Amino acid sequence: ELKDYIEKLKSLRGLQPELRSTLEGIPKTAHPMDVLRTGCSVLGNLEQEEGFLNQTDHADRMLSAFPSILSYWYQFSHHGKRIDTETNDDTIGGHFLHLLHGKKPSQLHNQVMSVSLILYAEHEFNASTFAARVCASTLSDIHSAVTSAIGTLRGPLHGGANEAASAMLSQWNDPDVAEVELLKMLTKKQLVMGFGHAVYTESDPRNEVIKQWSKKLSLEVNDKHLYDVSERVEAVMRREKNLFANADFYHASTYEFMGIP
């Protein structure tokens, strides 16, 4: 049954010419979340929902097509390439990394990306899923509901914490320097992304999982500072503010090590 489902998802990775044309018109300055939002909406026009009974098929199609949508736009807007989005990778994460880098990912990268997607799926009842449910409760179609969710996740008060954490960490090449600069940020009461959680109060169990994978990737790429800086920032935030790293924090280094822009 699992094998059949994997093969089904593989068969749904292609993009229609109309969708590819739309993606080619989006500038490279666009945020990937905006690209995904638009891609989902266009897909809903090209593959219209005829009734609630086939929503599962539409959900499978979106699972397969979203990595294709993001990667096609990225490769065309940044490198002028029109890529074939139909790979033979067994996993969604492997499919995405293959399209992003133009080659089949290593077993380690494939596994890490799958773990990452699972961890982010385990995010309880948050703003984006709530937005999707509100939209669905009006008996709107599934593409509208998912588009609503993507638009909600686009907001900085909900999504983007790993991106913000990555931007912060990239400024520091030494743990000692990172501690000094972080203390300055705290003195100025500046927001430090990637810490605390609305539901978890003592720790985020997802953080422990992704942190382990970040360390493995750090060793693989012979990282000189990013993982050590991340650990120091985590320790300082716990010491100074009694705040724990959430799932987003070590995703910053994890994605950096895998070459995800």
Please give the residue ranges for each predicted region.
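Hydrophobic alpha-helical bundle cores within soluble ligand-binding/oligomerization subdomains
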Residues: 1-261
